[in-house]
From Swiss-Prot:
Domain called Integrase catalytic: residue spans: 921-1078
Domain RNase H type-1, first and last residues per copy: 617-740
Catalytic activity entry: Endohydrolysis of RNA in RNA/DNA hybrids. Three different cleavage modes: 1. sequence-specific internal cleavage of RNA. Human immunodeficiency virus type 1 and Moloney murine leukemia virus enzymes prefer to cleave the RNA strand one nucleotide away from the RNA-DNA junction. 2. RNA 5'-end directed cleavage 13-19 nucleotides from the RNA end. 3. DNA 3'-end directed cleavage 15-20 nucleotides away from the primer terminus; 3'-end directed exonucleolytic cleavage of viral RNA-DNA hybrid; DNA(n) + a 2'-deoxyribonucleoside 5'-triphosphate = DNA(n+1) + diphosphate
Composition skew (Basic and acidic residues), residue ranges: 45-59
Domain Reverse transcriptase: 230-419
Gene: pol
Gene Ontology molecular function: aspartic-type endopeptidase activity; DNA binding; dUTP diphosphatase activity; exoribonuclease H activity; magnesium ion binding; RNA stem-loop binding; RNA-directed DNA polymerase activity; RNA-DNA hybrid ribonuclease activity
The organism of origin for this protein: Equine infectious anemia virus (isolate 1369) (EIAV)
Single GO biological process annotation from the record: dUMP biosynthetic process
PANTHER family in the cross-refs: ENDOGENOUS RETROVIRUS GROUP K MEMBER POL PROTEIN (PTHR41694), RNA-DIRECTED DNA POLYMERASE-RELATED (PTHR41694:SF3)
Region (Disordered): 13-77
Designated name of the protein: Pol polyprotein
Highest taxon of the lineage: Viruses
DNA-binding region: 1096-1144
Amino acid sequence: TAWTFLKAMQKCSKKREARGSREAPETNFPDTTEESAQQICCTRDSSDSKSVPRSERNKKGIQCQGEGSSRGSQPGQFVGVTYNLEKRPTTIVLINDTPLNVLLDTGADTSVLTTAHYNRLKYRGRKYQGTGIIGVGGNVETFSTPVTIKKKGRHIKTRMLVADIPVTILGRDILQDLGAKLVLAQLSKEIKFRKIELKEGTMGPKIPQWPLTKEKLEGAKEIVQRLLSEGKISEASDNNPYNSPIFVIKKRSGKWRLLQDLRELNKTVQVGTEISRGLPHPGGLIKCKHMTVLDIGDAYFTIPLDPEFRPYTAFTIPSINHQEPDKRYVWNCLPQGFVLSPYIYQKTLQEILQPFRERYPEVQLYQYMDDLFVGSNGSKKQHKELIIELRAILLEEGFETPDDKLQEVPPYSWLGYQLCPENWKVQKMQLDMVKNPTLNDVQKLMGNITWMSSGVPGLTVKHIAATTKGCLELNQKVIWTEEAQKELEENNEKIKNAQGLQYYNPEEEMLCEVEITKNYEATYVIKQSQGILWAGKKIMKANKGWSTVKNLMLLLQHVATESITRVGKCPTFKVPFTKEQVMWEMQKGWYYSWLPEIVYTHQVVHDDWRMKLVEEPTSGITIYTDGGKQNGEGIAAYVTSNGRTKQKRLGPVTHQVAERMAIQMALEDTRDKQVNIVTDSYYCWKNITEGLGLEGPQSPWWPIIQNIREKEIVYFAWVPGHKGICGNQLADEAAKIKEEIMLAYQGTQIKEKRDEDAGFDLCVPYDIMIPVSDTKIIPTDVKIQVPPNSFGWVTGKSSMAKQGLLINGGIIDEGYTGEIQVICTNIGKSNIKLIEGQKFAQLIILQHHSNSRQPWDENKISQRGDKGFGSTGVFWVENIQEAQDEHENWHTSPKILARNYKIPLTVAKQITQECPHCTKQGSGPAGCVMRSPNHWQADCTHLDNKIILTFVESNSGYIHATLLSKENALCTSLAILEWARLFSPKSLHTDNGTNFVAEPVVNLLKFLKIAHTTGIPYHPESQGIVERANRTLKEKIQSHRDNTQTLEAALQLALITCNKGRESMGGQTPWEVFITNQAQVIHEKLLLQQAQSSKKFCFYKIPGEHDWKGPTRVLWKGDGAVVVNDEGKGIIAVPLTRTKLLIKPN
């Protein structure tokens, strides 16, 4: 080891002592304060410094840092050198402009110059009285002399002792002024590395390094030099092909920080189970007398990385203008940003702390990442000894706990909370909102409120959350409402007045009090006798159609799980509803497998009306309700069992609103206390019996709820709309009586007249010129439904008759539903010009009694059809059975049924709603994705423990799927070959699954010339097409499982249903769209070949000649030139700029 122990006896003056112990300026130190290293600065003040035993110095090594950087360990170097103390740490410095080889001795308080070196100085100063120093050979006489020391651009003037000793020593006084520091390398040799493996079929990242600016490059080199000297990185081997790019950012302190983009490496690593599933909560801490919070410094850089895995972490330091070859390094310790660094660190620290936990089971020791909490109930001295022992255990393994982050007095900052011996709080935070907030700003605000709600009871976010509706982009501006601002101010007031919360007492029971706010948010507090332990909130899912009791029962399960997680015990619940309501919810056979202990209050929530609903018919009156909508007008009606009928015109409402209003009318008009309501609206029946949630007076369902409250019992039943039920048919007819009183029409070219005028005006669809004696048929987009016992008459207008325009429109009977065409003849003496929008004819409705017509039925197609006068149609009723059979076999969609069997869409939808499998369908995820012919998406899904690989063409929605025996590269490659054989794909988009990014699959797609993309390059929902296809395919498979013996057979039947039994673009099936696209591609190729193969001729001019030649046949045409056979020069190429192409001459 180095000779470093000359004990200097300080007898010099206080002035010299002060001069020798002064701290070097902070700006003169190299930037070694990054998170990647822990450094110990040497000072002369022995009271503030800690001695480092020789044994530890032998392990850790010494590093001196100043300005500049270099590599190696020759005596001429000084900065960025690591000494392992196998030989003396020496360097060359200029003393009085004389180069001298000196020993660096951090154990010496004072620097000493040898007599020989003193005699070699180019110039020497005066001699002053020195002090005696005690060395190995006894007391040594000295004198002092002023010197000037230069090293790496640093100049210092001081005094040195001169003595007859073997070697010149630079002690701590001069080393400190030169900017040297003692750095203890923290890569622990005591900790065993953990094995890291790559996923099967993957390889390490090979991403090139992007350029860095000169300023960032200098910062990176400085950091890398320090990491290299500390042993945290090493030079990469010459045969290492891997690389992940680095970038450098400047911190607020102005110092650089080096980061590495390890995202591609993280994708290839085999990741285990997460062992840290959440943050510890102060409400679960047991109250203790003494607390201490510690922070572990540079935790990742203490743990060694698996040597076999280190090559995959390689990175590159480039140079400006390629001045020198790039320098490449690999990590020896856990790098920041690596997916397994948190797991390995926490697991390693857990094993280190386990003996301490077993030795002191009564001590609360919480470990989360690099934050430690220690709580005990012993004496203050005993607690301090525990902390010393714990820090020693960590230090022995290489983990340091810096003094500046050691919290021994309250309040303690821990994981965003403020701890005191008697209570705890959320760290104070003022909730603010910018003037024009974006979606990102509001989301951050909501996150802060949610975080603080556990420590500040009563915080709400309903109105703030409402401002984000309809916003998709993070930078999209939101409309900040007055309600949201008021809610924010109320939350700030609650935060300002918040009191400290208590710690858990294991000797007492806990009580959870649940309340519902005016904003329909459920808030709760967990209490003991000493006060509130923690609080929380949950927005009730009213929009999900869940009842209040169902919401609160879910909340109880959530709170019970949260409480068991934090303290290992479930509280007793005090809830704002009655026991009867809970029992009613339980009787519905819902999902509750466990019910906590509940204390019921007298408060009754809004959905007490549900107690009036029964499962069996009552002895009271039965009312059949129905609602409909056509031509923008809604009709609500009902028929009672005693023959009473009522209809009501609702105006422009939806069909569902009409159904709901019919039920409301029936309940309002019935005075009976026991009522049976029968509806054909599955939507209304499902909502009333199960779906309605927290409904207030502003809800459209509130009148129905209020009327149910006034009854004793109410029975609701649902029947399909076309099952031949007498009462339902009567209600259906009643809903049409009001509708048929007036003319029903569609179109934009029909205008209503004044109240005192008869009929309607018809308008010209576009500008038309009618010559003299010419007859034209003018089409319109007007369709009408003539009332019963009436007919329509198209005739002219007096204003047009003056100009000589004769209208021969004709009679429209009540069976015709096609578009109206008007026959016009110019009998005048000049041409007549009709302008778009001009009123040129009129339609008058007249009654007649010559024909006996049946009442209007919206579910009937005209006998004439829609092709004009004289055409005939067919009734669709006889096709219902065939459509039902079709749907039972193939689960065809409503639009395809309506198109194939010529039945109304409403009837087709009713057939679909009756199917128990198809009623479960919902809408898939929405979003903009890349769609084009022959662009496919692929994904693997699982059903019945089997793997299904799904391909879906993004343009048509055509699905191809196959079963895989294993989800690996080989099986995926075989499936891709089969897919490529059947189709002609140009591109494929998948996720980052191991089977899709495996090297064999990537190479196969390259060989097939299929462009392959992964991840989310186009949109965060770029997998939306195939995910939606997977869900649809699974639903169709389940629909066919009853009729098949194997999953393979059900899969093939489901593919037929998905591709040929549901609508896609423009009402066509995916199969029809796909075939049409392929035919179009083939047609375009044939046209291109035909165009290229056709004979072309041209005139041409040879460069250097003035006369045009030709015409002659073009032998070949390229993008920039043509090839012709010139009479004089033979076959030559002529630029297109000197040619004139033409068709074959006669």
